[in-house]
């Protein structure tokens, strides 16, 4: 072996440290003589490396990358020895760590060495699988740190920890060594002393003399050693001057004579502190000392024990007395005493009652209460206290020493196996076993080792546990040995009564390692991989090569040696799998021939891998040149305006057919067409001029290869078409409009006309003007043209006509000549030449939350034909100024002051006018101001409508054509229509916002209420359902119900979009002559976020939990996070409306359903009607179809239908459905299952990416005719119209829980799913079923006959209950039978009916009067309507009519006892029958009845009415 090493030391290898471009690996130079080799390396610029280090280099590089592996075998003199590492100083490792240190505290650095050169050793800590790690070792450096904070003190007792470290080399096979050592946990002063009593209350005789012992204070410390030493002092507080204390023993002495009488007491503060001051730890306690009479003496112990008591730790006799003490009370008249064994704060002071006592008379015995353990506690200090009847006490301390016994069996560390290589000589170390004995003294814990078997193969050192080999092993003969080791301690066992030491047994597996002495070889000499596509992805597997080696320990490493041009491929270092590494190109290389090497660390083998590349269509067509053309605008061409040509780079022959097809990319307006020859034709004429034309038009021509069939590749080429201008545009006016001309002005030039022409041709700028021949005679009379000037022929009177629209014909001078008519808007300026007259106006104000600031609300109006005369008027109050309003005398503007109360105000003014043409005069003006306070809830719960083709002034004003007293503005008409629609009074409806938008639309917000305000989804939902009706009543068009700035996709936001309602206390004013409106400035803005509404309040009677704002305490049954009622049931014909959802990037809908039938619409989110002005077709529908959930989603560009087909939903079982809507995917999951069978995926159709819906979310069904709506909106999939039958629970959308039990609009629902669900089943009818029915019918017939016969036999006295008070009396029996009672005429008691029975000819009229079941009843409206109906009823009786209350016979004056009784009014009336009227009359029954209203039955009562 030494010779081999010497040979290696004289052998050198020249290494090229830079990889060659083709091979990509290190290439060793050819071995030569030392000097020649050295010189050659210097010439080549390479580095000389000794051969003995070459193997390490080869192995290290091979492990790093297969591409860097050497392709030549190592030096032939390499012996291949593999020896195990060994720790240098394992026995000397004795690290210490202080307790309470943080994690990552340094412990120790271990080091192991390996005799083999260039070995890399990795370190690890050996521990059991479920053991919590307390240390971490750096695998490379061997540095050990803590991962745990240790506590040496009670109750943890972490005084030491055994650590086993394993060192493993990187040989083949890897060998290891272990080292076990003890880490001592050192104590620190981290515990303050703890007094052995919670309080000290002692007594002292009144004649006690100075230096007399008063009492003893005792404190313990959990710490160890000097850290546990405690000293005492009396703080200079209270009565400290009377006492002194021994700082070591804690004995308190009297310092000066007592000056207090019996019954009084002294108080001092005693401090116990550690002797070790770093860090300082102390504790304080108050001590009270009562002064007692001199005749009262404390008890004393008769036989105190002053020497320690020694106990073996294995003592198990719990009845035997350990110590006996006797005491006397020192009170002859009261000899009784009471003993107490103090339980201190530590285990050493009996905190866990390790010792107990038993008192018999004045004697006490102490015995064992728990087992002892020397390894935990070595000594105890017991404090026995004796007290007499005067509560005077005396203490005595007993010291107990615990003696160690051999009661622990040695145990082994976690290392259970070792390895020795085959053919190693005798004496080779195999492994080291370590065992430990937990006994506390060296007399019991020294461990020695011996082998129980296999002594002919191995030997063990009895002291160190090192196992060495006694022979040479052959792995092929036997590959492992199970060796049993016995660990014995050094004294007789206390566990077994045999005089032998404790022994621990453990079997260790020693494996015989294999040596690498065989060469690997490939299974094939040549591998072939065909048809590898050139567009194969990186890491695509091409082929796998495999080499075999007879040595089990050999790790074969693979590398590519040559042929890998451009690093196109890579090979798995250990797997042999060849994969694509770089992009391939068939046009560059069509075939690779790789040389692959297999290397086992010593020997190698080679094989060839041929990889053939297959061409794919991966190159787009290439156009031969850039293209442009110039043509005339507005001209058609029959032939090609341009021909383009492209070729396919994948086809080598450019003269061959290139199989290119052409098309127009983004053919807007279908203006172009192109054929496969590249001929571009013009389909529609092109315009060059503004506003819609362009000078240059861009055409994108797309070329696809492979004839456009299958997987084709395309490219797009831009073609520029330039247009030549022709004179095809007529000129138009560009004057600023309107043009003003003052009234009463003499004829003259009004304005110089200016025009423009979009054409660029010569002559386009030379224009002629004239009054159009089609103008009215009035225009032609009053106006004329003078060149390019408009001339006024007459004087104008604004009061006769305020403006004119004059048609001007303008012509250019181009060829051909172009002319057109433009309208000139002329306004006649006003001159104050008319006197004013008295006027009146009305101003309506909504004061939002009563917080309106000073607000201009409108001007004082007087009737005046002049418009521009404000500067000639002066305004003043007619009487005294109003304290709630201020008047601007110059402008007539009325300002409402702050805190103006709600109500109607009549204001009177005097307006004075004086101008050049009108003499000074004054008139009265009257303004009615109505102020209405609007709460915040009305705005938050408001509905909204966006109108078109109407201005805000037109909306609030009464049209001039309807200036009658009963005429209404559009705003008032809307308010009236909404009141009818919501079945409430007009006063309960507020139209409080009227805002004009820049796009000439008008936004109106409104609210309505019964008792609370109606939810916005109810308002918007009902209005949307009746949109056509409202449009007809108002003669207006609605662009949108529920104003939603996010409805049009990507109009406001590119991604998520949420509407936010902005509200301002500053009012918004709209002014017209006779009407002004001051409303709330409330509007919706789009926020580009996805946020669910924050639910900060508790619903349904819940209350916030104290100190937790987001937690609610709810009433039973309301289980939502904010007391929502989270369930609702439907019965197949109902529905419920809830708030809509926002358009989000990621919308998650989760709900639970319990179906009863297998068909029905569960959820619908989409439009409620068809609006041709804004045909948004987005919708979502979730339905059951034959028990399977089906989800249909349309983002507005096509519907996708997702059908789950794995889990069929059956009746009475609850299922969870999760829906995730994303921009590019739609997912539906059943029962929160993540398997592919439980998930159903789909992708949106078309370019749209969001669900944009502003209608309410509908559950259980919908009132919308989905079939008709689907036809109008061109839906490709129409949801099922049939309603859902079952229960829906726990609906959350984007983590917002819905209050399902409280919908805003509903029909046929069961909130909370409380009612039982009845389901119909069909039974088959067979012969047995028919027989059973016949038998049942026969039994019923027999029972009926028996009842009839029995009734015939009943006594007549029992037939009194069949009396009837109807007109045809069946049997009238009363005491006046001989009188003419049977002649009682019931017709006199009949009154004329209040209402006649009338058939409604118009079924819609009846339907219109029906209250919606969701409406909250308004009792005031109800009574008012009923009163109005009674007042208007022409068929009602007169107010004064005769009512007969007591009448018998035909004027008979005879009486009887019965008749007297029936007419008397002297007795109390009996109202017990009220309880039978049901729960609605329960209060009346409780007020007037004698019996409780909740009586189960009144059938036996005298006047029990049966309803």
UniProtKB/Swiss-Prot annotation:
One of its GO terms (molecular function) is beta-catenin binding. N-glycosylation is important for biosynthesis and function. Glycans are attached at residues 317, 466, 552, 766, 949, 983, 999, 1073, 1145, 1274, 1290. Residues 1488-1507 are annotated as: Disordered. Residues 1084-1123 form the EGF-like domain. Disruption phenotype: RNAi-mediated knockdown in segment A8 of the male genital disk causes loss of the normal dextral rotation of the genital plate and results in a phenotype with no rotation. During oocyte border cell migration, RNAi-mediated knockdown in either the border cells (BC) or in the surrounding nurse cells results in various BC migration defects such as BC deviating from their migration path or failing to sustain the directed, posterior movement. RNAi-mediated knockdown in the outer migratory BC disrupts distribution of Rac1 in the BC cluster but does not affect motility and cells remain clustered. It is found in: Cell membrane; Apical cell membrane. This is DE-cadherin.
